Amino acid sequence: MFSKFEFDGKLNPTFVEGAFKLPLSSIRAYLKEPISPRFIHVGSAGITRPDRAGLDLSKQPPAVRLNKELDFILTFKLKQGEDLIRESGIPYTIVRTCALTEEPAGANLIFDQGDNITGKISREEVAQICVAALESPYASGKTFEVKSVVPFSEPFTVDPQNPPPEKDYNVYFKTLKDGITGKEILEHDPVPV
């Protein structure tokens, strides 16, 4: 891109009128340390599993089993969603939820990395996790999966007379590692808190 004028106010001989491009390699301006996420992406647990060697698809959620029939939706979400976010340079958090429910928030949770867990989680809980992540430097640059400990077969309810205590999501965020996307297979146990 060339200016129409040189620094001395004379016409620039290399200037060409028309459209121009200004490519950016990252966006970072005046962010104070420690940096909390500026972008929260809510995605799907199972996103890296369709191409995983040796995976028993019969034990996987429908979206994983049917990725090909669904026009490779999980592959698209990974390559055109998560991977682009990670490459953008914007401080981010990627929250991969298990099956979403209309149950209330408050169940005990399991946060995991490596894209190995299945289960369910309340939409209300996911919203609370996202808000907490926006304020937490511990969540920045992290990709994780989350589910409740309550099995699918059991509904989770809250007694209004005895509601569950508020969660400090930083307890969970502090256990997460940088650079874990699920493309690599992790051999570890999920971290219940």
Predicted regions and their residues:
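Oxidoreductase cofactor-interface core, primarily capturing Rossmann-like NAD(P)-dependent enzymes
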Residues: 1-7, 17, 25, 31-193
